[in-house]
Curated annotation (Swiss-Prot):
<keyword id="KW-0010">Activator</keyword>
<feature type="site" description="Interaction with DNA">
    <location>
        <position position="291"/>
    </location>
</feature>
<feature type="region of interest" description="Disordered">
    <location>
        <begin position="1"/>
        <end position="47"/>
    </location>
</feature>
<keyword id="KW-0217">Developmental protein</keyword>
<dbReference type="InterPro" id="IPR002910">
    <property type="entry name" value="FLO_LFY"/>
</dbReference>
<dbReference type="Pfam" id="PF17538">
    <property type="entry name" value="C_LFY_FLO"/>
</dbReference>
<comment type="function">
    <text>Probable transcription factor required for the specification of floral meristem identity.</text>
</comment>
<dbReference type="GO" id="GO:0006355">
    <property type="term" value="P:regulation of DNA-templated transcription"/>
</dbReference>
<feature type="compositionally biased region" description="Basic residues">
    <location>
        <begin position="187"/>
        <end position="196"/>
    </location>
</feature>
<dbReference type="InterPro" id="IPR038276">
    <property type="entry name" value="Floricaula/leafy_C_sf"/>
</dbReference>
<feature type="compositionally biased region" description="Pro residues">
    <location>
        <begin position="31"/>
        <end position="47"/>
    </location>
</feature>
<feature type="site" description="Interaction with DNA">
    <location>
        <position position="284"/>
    </location>
</feature>
<keyword id="KW-0238">DNA-binding</keyword>
<dbReference type="Pfam" id="PF01698">
    <property type="entry name" value="SAM_LFY"/>
</dbReference>
<feature type="DNA-binding region">
    <location>
        <begin position="237"/>
        <end position="241"/>
    </location>
</feature>
<keyword id="KW-0805">Transcription regulation</keyword>
<protein>
    <recommendedName>
        <fullName>Protein ALF</fullName>
    </recommendedName>
</protein>
Amino acid sequence: MDPEAFSASLFKWDPRGAMPPPNRLLEAVAPPQPPPPPLPPPQPLPPAYSIRTRELGGLEEMFQAYGIRYYTAAKITELGFTVNTLLDMKDDELDDMMNSLSQIFRWELLVGERYGIKAAIRAERRRLEEEEGRRRHILSDGGTNVLDALSQEGLSEEPVQQQEREAAGSGGGGTAWEVVAPGGGRMRQRRRKKVVVGRERRGSSMEEDEDTEEGQEDNEDYNINNEGGGGISERQREHPFIVTEPGEVARGKKNGLDYLFHLYEQCRDFLIQVQNIAKERGEKCPTKVTNQVFRFAKKAGASYINKPKMRHYVHCYALHCLDEDASNALRRAFKERGENVGAWRQACYKPLVAIAARQGWDIDAIFNGHPRLSIWYVPTKLRQLCHSERSNAAAAASTSVSGGGVDHLPHF
């Protein structure tokens, strides 16, 4: 018997008996499993206005910040009202809508809800207007704004300084009707430089305050050529005016005086539209042609109506309204002599001062008493001329009285 075979069979190692069970082997080798992750915190419930947002047609976004209940907005939608419908409604129509809501659904509106609905509608209107204004501003900056046919027909790229040369070259130089005080030209040049520097510092996009409308008339003689850009850059402007007789159509690239007076009638129509819009919105209603009217005209496409030009010739329009026969006679006389529009404009002051002299020198009362002139501010230069002539007349009267009394004084 082979001893090696015996020992091998006796001490043969059984690997199946020596190996632990598979489960225990895995338990010993595999690392311990991490604990399961904690459950995420429960999401907060969305506000009531975010539920079924599409069913309210946008009312929830407009009413959410004004304390209006979701049920109230839902019932307004059930009545068939949308955001666009509410924005186009007047205040009395909104009151009727809220009364109908209370009567039909027997839903009592809170006092704050009644005011909140109107406040939300006004805020939405302002937001839409601001967006429209920004859009128009971007388009105008890009040069893509389209002028209407009337303004495009009479536009040119000639330098803005031409009208200033016309006024400087007008006839009758050196008279009191051209300048109120001596040295006025130098003062205007100094003021013009100050205005240019001041506007460069403030930026050309800053708009003038409407509360200083009447005070800003002082600069009408040089502000006519410096609109918007502070006199820094040339702007697209209308063809210059020429003196024409009543009913005469200007030839070539010119505009007649009948067209000029028609622009003032258009301004009156724009003022009426602005007043109607302000009444519908419950806002302050302007009574005179202010910056608000000029901005409205520009938005409506009538960019050929601008403040400097309309203020520059307002006294000419006043003479046309107060004494049309005298205005027509003046136009014919200057047309026959071949005078330019600057000379005609200066000559329009004298008949107005004569009219004021016959009515107690109260030029403001004359303007306010006329239906077509009451919407315009009295030009500062016209008021100064009336004051100057009144002072001269009073001085002459006092001199004549004192001179007549000297002869009767006793001689020592």
